[in-house]
Amino acid sequence: MFTMKKSLLLFFFLGTISLSLCEQERGADEDDGVEITEEEVKRGLMDTVKNVAKNLAGHMLDKLKCKITGC
């Protein structure tokens, strides 16, 4: 029973250390988040283009509706 407790304690201790190291590594990766990736730039550009096209289409439909109804 005592050896089982020792092995469980050792297992818990080693697991805690490895978890701590993983969290430190993840924290280091998050600190490097200042750099903007090419994918983020593309995503931002596509969102902008999509919003402009959406607004332009809405404006054109409003003009067309106004011409049809005579407002």
Curated annotation (Swiss-Prot):
Disulfide bond recorded as keyword: yes
Main location: secreted
Lineage: superkingdom: Eukaryota
Tissue-specific expression: Expressed by the skin glands.
Any matching Pfam family: FSAP_sig_propep
Signal peptide span: 1-20
GO cellular component: extracellular region
InterPro entries assigned to the protein according to its UniProt record, in alphabetical order: Antimicrobial_frog_2 (IPR012521), Frog_antimicrobial_propeptide (IPR004275)
This protein's UniProt keywords: Amphibian defense peptide, Antibiotic, Antimicrobial, Disulfide bond, Fungicide, Secreted, Signal
Cell compartments where the protein resides: Secreted
Similarity remark: Belongs to the frog skin active peptide (FSAP) family. Ranatuerin subfamily.
Described function: Antibacterial activity against Gram-positive bacterium S.aureus and Gram-negative bacterium E.coli. Has activity against C.albicans.
Name of the protein in its database record: Ranatuerin-2P
Gene source species: Lithobates pipiens (Northern leopard frog)
